[in-house]
């Protein structure tokens, strides 16, 4: 146990003195000629003085330490009731006063030796108990300043019982108490080794500057870093530097693979053998964990024991990460891979995600987690997340996607919802309070978007109050009278316009029906054919259907920036120094393969707050409860989606049916598929 600070350590100094006295009388006992009455008398006088000091020490402890502790803790009692100091003093007095014949003297000497041996065997453990049990209790029940005051009184009382020489000697001993305690605790070899480490020389590694040591630490794996942190305080601080813990792979580490580099260099497709072993480990561990009353004498197979042991090792490693490492380095973690974990749980994942707000790559493939794993995700909690793999997490539901959408935040283009607060002269504090909502629909004002009636309505644009944006050919922008009410900028031969609020035809009539970006070309044309539109006469309105065919690639539209009438409203989001357009909703990879409880509701939750403008990879294989309508609504807000990396069930008639890659779970033995068993 580590020593306590010297100024509040109540036992080490006095106990060192007591141990020194024990050593002295043991030495005298072995060197005394008991057949010589003078030698025996000198020994008894020395023992009498020694035990009087023991008695004085006991009284000081009772009055200034144990007595105070008993006032605050009722669990402390009878501490010094059985040390037999008084009986020993009576024994010494009897030996000094009575004149004995030779026979009685031999019996007395034998009794003296036995009683001293018994006392010594009890007294030394008693002092150790006080140091290891009562000192921590005192630190718990008394403040630091109270402990310092008690220490001063204890020292003063011990010194008051000695003459000037003893006083000076005692002060010197107590000042060196901590080092002397170490001398008693460790062997001669350990002491020599410790002293050699503390002696600094010009060639010692401890003389290197921290920058050089940190550079050396970058070549160490996580296991070596943990060992280095136990060397001394300086190394412990360096080992907790965030840059050394950017990539975490606990599942690999628990199995002896201490890789800690970028995930790009890992094989993302483990073989079936590896997956099968992880499944066996998980199953064996769950069966063992569920039966807490299992008979230890019951024989289990060697392979099952190995699986349980491996899962237990993984669980211990995860707990150590959560309690001892992530609180210090969590903000620097970019990669967290727990794919095929045997022992992880929703609670552990939730704690890890709370400590790691700047994650970019999260892989929870085939883990036994539920929606509660993401309870810690508040608004904007993972704006930097680029990659999330939830393949095989068959317990998650639409609630997880709602939380993910909330945590991804809102890009600057969608913060126009705050203009309502701005126009009502609401304070910045009111806006910030709204940002703390757990529902992105509440933050953006799109609370009706979770309603099935909303998505069943063909004219969805009427429920969105932000000014519409129109895209048309810059070679024919429209009438000059109309252009007076427009604000536009040219990008790649296109005009991107936003209409001023004064143009009322954009809040009702034909103009309000056009919502490029929420409708595909085909969907928009079908809607216009079916809707009864009373045209207002604007050239722009008449050109809408014509110019919709000239839209550029989705990636070009994503990079076009527009400014509204109040676009320089104060940014109320954390990290406002950097562009939200770049920071928020940066997700590029989303895999929900085998998550069969996901429905259209969850997919549509991802469309709120700006959709997923940078999403390139979307895997919905085995999501049996989604429909073509839900897929269409999500894809419409994912302009960067690559058809080659777009997977969904072959039985669903959805978007990009001719070019999408279909279902990946066909003939898969461990993930949901509607054709399982074929």
UniProtKB/Swiss-Prot annotation:
Family annotation (CDD domains): F-box_FBXL5, Hr_FBXL5
Region (Hemerythrin-like): 1-159
Family matches, as SUPFAM superfamilies: F-box domain (SSF81383), RNI-like (SSF52047)
First-listed, main subcellular location of the protein, grouped into a coarse class: cytoplasm
Keywords on record: Cytoplasm, Iron, Iron-sulfur, Leucine-rich repeat, Metal-binding, Nucleus, Repeat, Ubl conjugation, Ubl conjugation pathway
Sequence positions that bind Fe(3+) 1: 15, 57, 61, 130
Region described as Disordered: 285-308
Domain of life according to the entry: Eukaryota
InterPro entries with a match to the protein in the record: F-box-like_dom_sf, F-box_dom, Hemerythrin-like, Hr_FBXL5, Leu-rich_rpt, Leu-rich_rpt_Cys-con_subtyp, LRR_dom_sf
GO annotation, cellular component aspect: nucleus; perinuclear region of cytoplasm; SCF ubiquitin ligase complex
Residue ranges of domain F-box in the record: 202-248
Sites where the protein binds Fe(3+) 2: 58, 61, 80, 126, 130
Annotated domain remarks: The hemerythrin-like region acts as an oxygen and iron sensor by binding oxygen through a diiron metal-center. In absence of oxygen and iron, the protein is ubiquitinated and degraded.
Protein name as it appears in the record: F-box/LRR-repeat protein 5
Annotated source species: Xenopus laevis
Lineage summary: Eukaryota, Metazoa, Chordata, Craniata, Vertebrata
């Amino acid at each position: 146990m580590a020593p306590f600070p010297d100024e509040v350590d109540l036992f080490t100094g006095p106990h060192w003195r007591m141990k020194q006295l024990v050593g002295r009388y043991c030495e005298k006992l072995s060197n005394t000629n008991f057949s010589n009455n003078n030698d025996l008398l000198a020994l008894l006088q020395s023992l009498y003085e020694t035990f009087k000091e023991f008695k004085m020490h006991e009284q000081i402890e009772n009055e200034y330490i144990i007595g105070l502790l008993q006032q605050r803790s009722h669990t402390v009692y009878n501490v010094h009731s059985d040390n037999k100091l008084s009986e020993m003093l009576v024994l010494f007095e009897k030996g000094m006063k009575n004149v004995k014949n030779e026979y009685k003297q031999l019996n007395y000497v034998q009794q003296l030796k036995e009683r001293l041996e018994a006392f010594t065997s009890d007294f030394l453990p008693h002092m150790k108990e006080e140091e290891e049990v009562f000192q921590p209790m005192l630190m718990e029940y008394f403040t630091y300043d109270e402990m310092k005051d008690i220490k001063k009184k204890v020292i003063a009382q011990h010194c008051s019982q000695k003459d000037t020489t003893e006083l000076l000697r005692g002060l010197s001993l107590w000042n060196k108490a901590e080092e002397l305690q170490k001398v008693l605790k460790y062997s001669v070899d350990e002491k020599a080794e410790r002293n050699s480490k503390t002696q600094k020389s010009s060639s010692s590694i401890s003389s290197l500057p921290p920058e050089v040591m940190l550079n050396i630490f970058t070549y160490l794996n996580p296991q070596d870093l943990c060992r280095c942190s136990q060397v001394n305080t300086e190394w412990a601080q360096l080992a907790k530097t965030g840059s050394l813990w950017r990539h975490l792979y606990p599942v690999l580490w628990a199995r002896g693979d201490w890789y800690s580099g970028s995930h790009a260099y890992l094989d993302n497709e483990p073989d079936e053998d590896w997956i099968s072993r992880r499944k066996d480990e998980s199953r064996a561990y769950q069966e063992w964990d569920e039966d807490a009353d299992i008979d230890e004498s019951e024989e289990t197979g060697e392979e099952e024991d190995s699986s349980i042991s491996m899962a237990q090792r993984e669980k211990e490693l995860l707990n150590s990460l959560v309690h001892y490492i992530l609180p210090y380095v969590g903000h620097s973690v970019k990669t967290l891979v727990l794919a095929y974990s045997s022992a992880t749980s929703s609670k552990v994942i939730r704690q890890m995600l709370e400590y790691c707000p700047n994650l970019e790559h999260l892989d929870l493939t085939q883990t036994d987690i539920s929606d509660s794993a993401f309870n810690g995700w508040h608004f904007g909690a993972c704006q930097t997340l680029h990659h999330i793999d939830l393949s095989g997490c068959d317990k998650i539901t639409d609630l997880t996607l709602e939380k993910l959408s909330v945590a991804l935040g809102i890009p600057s283009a969608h913060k126009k919802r705050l203009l309502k607060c701005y126009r009502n002269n609401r304070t910045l504090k009111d806006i910030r309070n709204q940002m703390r909502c757990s529902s992105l629909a509440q933050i953006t004002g799109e609370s009706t978007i979770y309603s099935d009636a909303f998505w069943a309505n063909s004219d969805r644009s009427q429920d969105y109050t932000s000014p519409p944006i129109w895209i048309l050919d810059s070679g024919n922008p429209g009438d000059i009278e109309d252009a007076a009410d427009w604000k536009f900028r040219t990008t790649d031969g296109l005009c991107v316009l936003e209409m001023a609020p004064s143009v009322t035809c954009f809040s009702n009539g034909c103009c309000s029906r056009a919502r490029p970006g929420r409708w595909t070309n085909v969907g928009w044309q079908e809607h216009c054919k079916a809707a009864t539109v009373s045209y207002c006469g604007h050239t722009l309105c008449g050109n809408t259907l014509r110019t919709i065919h000239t839209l550029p690639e989705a990636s070009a539209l994503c990079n076009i920036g527009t400014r509204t009438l109040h676009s320089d409203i104060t940014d109320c989001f954390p990290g406002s120094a950097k562009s939200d357009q770049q920071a928020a909703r940066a997700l590029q990879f989303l895999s929900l393969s085998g998550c069969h409880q996901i429905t259209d509701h969850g997919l549509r939750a991802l469309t709120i707050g700006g959709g997923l403008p940078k999403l390139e990879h979307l895997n919905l294989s085995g999501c049996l409860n989604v429909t073509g309508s839900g897929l269409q609504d999500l894809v419409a807000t994912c302009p960067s989606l690559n058809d080659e990396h777009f997977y969904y069930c072959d039985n669903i008639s959805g978007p990009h049916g001719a070019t999408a890659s279909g279902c990946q779970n066909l003939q898969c033995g461990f993930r949901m598929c509607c054709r399982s068993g074929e």
